[in-house]
Amino acid sequence: MMNFSNSYRQLGSDFYEESLPTPVLAPRLLLWNAPLAEQLMIPEELGQAALAQIFSGNQLLPGSEPIAMAYAGHQFGSFVPQLGDGRAHLLGEVFDKSGQRWDIQLKGSGPTQFSRGGDGRCAVGPALREFIMSEAMYALGVPTSRCLAVVTSGEDVYRRSILPGAIVTRIASSHLRVGTFEFFAARGEHEALKRLCDYTIDRHFPELQGATDQYIRFLDRVIGRQIQLITEWMRVGFIHGVMNTDNTSLAGETIDYGPCAMLGAYDPHTVYSSIDIKKRYAFGNQSAISQWNMTRLAECLLPLINADRNRAIDQLNPLLIAYTDRFNRVYIKMMGKKLGLTSLQAKDEKLIISLLDQLKIGKMDYTLTFDLLTKSLSSEPIASQMRGQLGNYFDLWQRRLKEQGTDLQEVQTLMRQQNPLLIPRNHHIEAAIAECEQTGRVNLAEKLLHVLRAPYEELTETHLYQDPPSDGDKNYQTFCGT
């Protein structure tokens, strides 16, 4: 079935608490990710009843030794010295058919020693959101954790109202977080911190092993992955919503989809999370927050760099100072590709910023605009439409494309690789959740998943999911749930 290993347990009991999932009354398989199951070599012959027992936590597989991981974190800028998995159980690690190692984690699987009075459960809505959103992000080409299954529990959970309960099975390259490092750094446990860093290097950056400056290079690599991740978020219009350090993956993957949402009309100040009152995690602020989170990681690494704290700071500071310029280079290159620019010139940054300014002023939809610009290269009616919306800018952009001398079909191919036809629109996600909460069915979710798994292709049903809601998400809010 699944051959579990448990390498994280070898770090020692300071890193986790042993914890078993709490059995549920009547597990039922709601969603199953067949392509991912095939990648993980899960036998096809297992029936839904058996899968529901396993991925509800009711039945443990041989070799699985569940734990709740310990970590701390900065939440909205304030440090909390102990958080940990309060409603999740790491079942262990498995290798897929290509030899890649994955964590297998249940969320909503019952209370742990880190629950802080919570029930350890998850409502079906947030579980469904994470499944749909993570699959959409994967198809869009964004580094992300993924969901293998959603199992309903047959039990109610009590939130703002009484809701059906569910357990979601998440896989990730690891669940190592900035907050994991903060947990030990805050306690001054430098030996444990070194073990953790060595383990993370072994798991994610093995090429650094043995280097005399491996911990400096480690920070550099993590920063690089974060820059790549945030750039991908900006490319597709993803707003994470809760970029706390305990939600910052050292593997450079999107994790913890709780209050996430997708950008509609372009505005860098857009926030949908109900708890982000000060707009700390607004769409346009995500790179700055990532830099802030990397600074927190750097602080944890200081005792591993040099016994003299000031010297350690001097060694790491250049990486943090360079973050903004480094991000901007990657971001501008990505935005250039969205506009079909095969090689950037100094003047192109102004071209990019001018378009974003125009989108903001005109309250134009981010995804639709780039989709239509892509289509305009082979459709005169769409070109005329975009010229009407963008005015002189459209002609300026077309002149720049002609100037670079690249065949327009090649340009359009480049643009389509960057610009999806559709994204997981907030109102479609909410409709799928509402259907499931009210009827227990996932018809809308399955139809939505079908098109979201091909975001760069024009399927028969694609047009049904492209348009933003009539109110432009004006009053839309998201809430933490999983």
UniProtKB/Swiss-Prot annotation:
Binding site for ATP: 84, 86-87, 107, 119-120, 170, 177, 256
Reaction(s) catalysed by this chain's protein: L-seryl-[protein] + ATP = 3-O-(5'-adenylyl)-L-seryl-[protein] + diphosphate; L-threonyl-[protein] + ATP = 3-O-(5'-adenylyl)-L-threonyl-[protein] + diphosphate; L-tyrosyl-[protein] + ATP = O-(5'-adenylyl)-L-tyrosyl-[protein] + diphosphate; L-histidyl-[protein] + UTP = N(tele)-(5'-uridylyl)-L-histidyl-[protein] + diphosphate
Native organism: Desulfotalea psychrophila (strain LSv54 / DSM 12343)
Keyword Nucleotide-binding: yes
Keywords in alphabetical order: ATP-binding, Magnesium, Manganese, Metal-binding, Nucleotide-binding, Nucleotidyltransferase, Transferase
Main EC class the enzyme belongs to: transferase
E.C. number: 2.7.7.-, 2.7.7.108
InterPro entries cross-referenced by the UniProt entry: SelO
Function: Nucleotidyltransferase involved in the post-translational modification of proteins. It can catalyze the addition of adenosine monophosphate (AMP) or uridine monophosphate (UMP) to a protein, resulting in modifications known as AMPylation and UMPylation.
Binding sites annotated in the UniProt record for Mg(2+): 247, 256
Molecular functions per Gene Ontology: AMPylase activity; ATP binding; magnesium ion binding
Family: Belongs to the SELO family.
Catalytic residues, chain numbering: 246
Alphabetical list of NCBIfam families matching this protein: PRK00029.1
Pfam families reported for this sequence: SelO
Positions of disulphide bridges: none
Organism superkingdom: Bacteria
Protein name: Protein nucleotidyltransferase YdiU
Cofactor: Mg(2+); Mn(2+)
